[in-house]
Curated annotation (Swiss-Prot):
EC numbers, comma separated: 2.7.6.3
Pfam families: HPPK
Phylogenetic classification of the source organism: Bacteria, Pseudomonadati, Aquificota, Aquificia, Aquificales
Catalyses which reaction(s): 6-hydroxymethyl-7,8-dihydropterin + ATP = (7,8-dihydropterin-6-yl)methyl diphosphate + AMP + H(+)
Highest rank taxon of the organism: Bacteria
Family the UniProt entry places it in: Belongs to the HPPK family.
Record carries keyword Transferase: yes
GO terms under biological process: folic acid biosynthetic process; tetrahydrofolate biosynthetic process
The protein's name in its UniProt record: 2-amino-4-hydroxy-6-hydroxymethyldihydropteridine pyrophosphokinase
């Protein structure tokens, strides 16, 4: 079983409802071990939109990275994600942040996530649940990357 870290976010409609539905669907093919606190953050990229609720989860999977990506895209669609524009509003967004300590660079899948160490809504929730995680490209602890922390705790840990 591979250890995977996913970043989830929502900034449209009933954000908590979308998040809970996504977790429920992910549990059909992942063994979720830890979930970070849910944080509220400003949108990244295209900033003229609602704030996101973001968190990170740690899970075990028997799926290969590309299989996992396909299942995640299916979950996003089933939960209600509508395709808009790059960095636009999202009912649910699920990113593969890390898959074991692998480095994957294909047209459809980039692991670790290309902006992992730059986005506070990835770094701080991930460090909350895995304080000693190593960035597989730089081979340095993620805690050495300190993007400006603009996160506001939104609510408690949802469930494990």
């Amino acid at each position: 079983m591979a250890t995977v870290y996913l970043g989830l976010g929502s900034n449209v409609g009933d954000r908590i409802s979308y998040i809970l539905k996504a977790i429920e669907k992910l549990e059909e093919f992942l063994e979720i071990e830890k979930i970070s606190t849910v944080y509220e953050s400003k949108a990244w990229g295209f900033e003229n939109q609602g704030n996101f609720l973001n968190f990170v989860l740690k899970a075990k999977t028997s799926l290969l990275p590309q299989e996992l990506l396909l299942k995640i895209k299916k979950v996003e669609k089933e939960v209600g994600r509508k395709e808009r524009f790059k960095w636009g509003p999202r009912e649910i967004d699920i990113d593969i942040l890390l898959y074991k300590d692998e480095v994957i660079r294909t047209k459809l899948l980039k692991v670790p996530h290309p902006f992992l160490e730059k986005r506070d809504f990835f770094v701080y929730p991930l460090l909350e649940i895995e304080p000693n995680v190593i960035h597989p490209i730089y081979r340095k602890p993620l805690k050495e990357f300190k993007p400006e922390n603009t996160l506001k705790p939104f609510c408690c840990i949802l469930k494990v």
